[in-house]
């Protein structure tokens, strides 16, 4: 039985030698759709744009007509997923100050699909930095970005209690005796760089400051914290590995940390190779092939966790990578800003030189090698570092992920789980309410001012030794709370010694009569001077 062309039923005898395939083939077939019958590209684009417009309109209506009174106000934005990403990413401080002027210290903005609740000012610093671990955490925010760079078993790739133990190990490796030894090492490293670098050949010249200071700070950190073997390996190959590993801090990796982008492939290869380098150094030390030293690697080799388990060599290696990577950006960028400001204000450079003559020179006017107790006499040098950290902290935003409903003190608002909370110590450090004329670089503002620290009643032990909560201050260049930077003392010392050595050897001024310092580049994870950032130097 079948259908005729006219649609009538046709009976076919079972024994009839009819080829069913031939019969079916003889039936009319519908021709395939031609290209002209398909939707045009213009139609598809128009449809896509229509959907986007509909989403944008719905998003605008929701913001204007149906705000959630139980949550902080939301910064107006056109598109629901993109939110304020473009304006925030272009200049975070400009965005935060503008939003603060309109909404107050507490507000929410949308950043690539995530709601970010901002709390500014001293109260905001305390709110975010002193949040309980059960209420908010850093691991889920920074883990995707940092874990592939730092490696397994350290920092955000482990429970917070283990991280606190690791911070304790590193902190107690930065003893006063260790800092005393670091001064000479740092000074010699800077002097040797000046003698050997092509950038400082002759009586005068011009340098692009950021790459020069990046090299100097990685050399000083390596010799002081990492040991002579690591310093000796800072060749072109190691520098290339560092560069590839540093590429893992690309902002896109907050969202796509394991995507097969070229920079991620290079990151993973560099992490493995760098870890193998450290493991080889540790193996040689355990075999007694290298004389005992007092650096961080030797210290960590003798440490054990609370459960009695010695730190595995792989974790020591990853901790050393973390120390190298985590501190390098801030030190390099701050050292660059110091040089740029001294070139912009040459009289301040001369004040620094005169301070060394007044405090350290012998009866013949000769300056001795630096030591920890002599560096501590250089108050203006210390003020230069503090003031530069105040104005140019490399990390403009610090976030945590909210895990349970979080009431905002002194408001009727609650931050829901899934939001990120954001503190920006740089906003309070550059606000008129805390610092007079905050946009002016003025080291002398610290002549009679001390860094506000909490009193003894505010001391707390997060698991790595008693420390100030350090959050009720407008000046927090190294963060606060349980995640406060433990390398703070070394960072200050490193920057002060580098500054002292550079001032001893050179005078600085701007190129071609340029006024002021370059702008800030916010295109990477760590803000830095826009390049080229050139200055003139002249030997004393």
Curated annotation (Swiss-Prot):
Catalytic activity entry: a 14alpha-methyl steroid + 3 reduced [NADPH--hemoprotein reductase] + 3 O2 = a Delta(14) steroid + formate + 3 oxidized [NADPH--hemoprotein reductase] + 4 H2O + 4 H(+); a 14alpha-methyl steroid + reduced [NADPH--hemoprotein reductase] + O2 = a 14alpha-hydroxymethyl steroid + oxidized [NADPH--hemoprotein reductase] + H2O + H(+); a 14alpha-hydroxymethyl steroid + reduced [NADPH--hemoprotein reductase] + O2 = a 14alpha-formyl steroid + oxidized [NADPH--hemoprotein reductase] + 2 H2O + H(+); a 14alpha-formyl steroid + reduced [NADPH--hemoprotein reductase] + O2 = a Delta(14) steroid + formate + oxidized [NADPH--hemoprotein reductase] + H2O + 2 H(+)
Role of this protein: Sterol 14-alpha demethylase; part of the gene cluster that mediates the biosynthesis of tetrahydropyranyl antifungal agent lanomycin that acts as an inhibitor of CYP51 and blocks the ergosterol biosynthesis. Sterol 14-alpha-demethylase plays a critical role in the biosynthesis of ergosterol, the major sterol component in fungal membranes that participates in a variety of functions. Acts as a self-resistant CYP51 that contains mutations found in CYP51s isolated from azole resistance strains and that is not inhibited by the final product of the cluster, lanomycin.
Any single GO BP term: sterol biosynthetic process
Protein location: Membrane
Highest rank taxon of the organism: Eukaryota
Protein residues bound to heme: 485
Protein name, UniProt field: Sterol 14-alpha demethylase
Cofactor: heme
Pfam family for this entry, one: p450
GO cellular component, one term: membrane
Keywords carried by this UniProt record: Heme, Iron, Lipid biosynthesis, Lipid metabolism, Membrane, Metal-binding, Monooxygenase, Oxidoreductase, Steroid biosynthesis, Steroid metabolism, Sterol biosynthesis, Sterol metabolism, Transmembrane, Transmembrane helix
Pathway where it operates: Steroid biosynthesis; sterol biosynthesis
Family: Belongs to the cytochrome P450 family.
A GO molecular function held by the record: monooxygenase activity
